Amino acid sequence: PYIHGTKVSSVSKGSLGDTVIIVPKTFEQEKIVNSLSDVDALIENLKKFIRKKKDIRQGTMQMLVTGKKRLDGFDGDWQTTTLDKLCRLVTKQTGFDYSAEIRPSLVTAPQIGTIPFIQNKDFEAFDINYNTDFFIPYDVAEKYPKILLDEVCLLISISGRIGNVAVFDNKQTAFAGGAVGIAKLFDPDLASWCMLYLSGKNGQEQIFSNEKVGAQHNLTVADVRKLEIRLPEKTEREAIIGVLADMDDEISLLVEKLHKYEKVKKGMMEELLTGKVRLM
């Protein structure tokens, strides 16, 4: 009731002065503060632990996908190839198609007959955000089969935030936005390895060595096609992917635990600071 304004919200000095604050006795204040501080410390320690686990995972990935460290039992040579040789199609949306038909058809909420319009902010590694900002009618999207996302493939950010690489998991059909490079592989099972390799040091160095700097940072489709990928044998690839997946699962469980702690803290604040729950 004290907030005013439509474009910019504000609170008047007088309204602030009239705000009623419930003040318990000093010893109870201290108990409440100490209880919340304990939870804060728990949350902060868990955040540090998660950061440490992520750093370890990143370091492990760099060592394994470059071949600097080999898992026990593997010593075969790695093959060097290019993304172009691994793919039946490497492409992107054209500006003409976007202006002529795609952009006018976009809607900001999912409707019957629409599919997600995936932008380069909507993907990273194995995560795809299907609940994105825009959706496109399928009858429009199907006119552009090359950029229709209806199979497991690679997505690469090629404009603005370049270097971001993900596996499109095909959990549902979607459509690629203009800043997204699409690499459709002959063997979709290679998508996870290619993503990990291009996300590692060697892959990122290649990507950024090809960037074109103008109004935005850009990669061309030709740049994407010539990206080199080093491939170990299938069994070694699967073993490396498995090790990193286990680490990802552990981190996900820790993040889930963190969210629970944060909810607990919010609940404690609502109960303790309103006096609904009193500490003895």
Residue ranges and their predicted role:
Residues D84-T108, K121-E151:
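Sequence-specific dsDNA recognition surfaces
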Residues P1, S10-L16, F117-K121, N131-S199:
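A short beta-sheet element
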Residues I3-F27, A109-I112, I158, T173-G181, ...:
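A short glycine-rich beta-alpha junction/loop motif
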Residues D18, T26, L71-I102, K226, ...:
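Non-catalytic DNA-recognition/assembly elements of restriction-modification systems
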Residues V23-D77, E228-M280:
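Amphipathic alpha-helical coiled-coil/heptad-repeat segments
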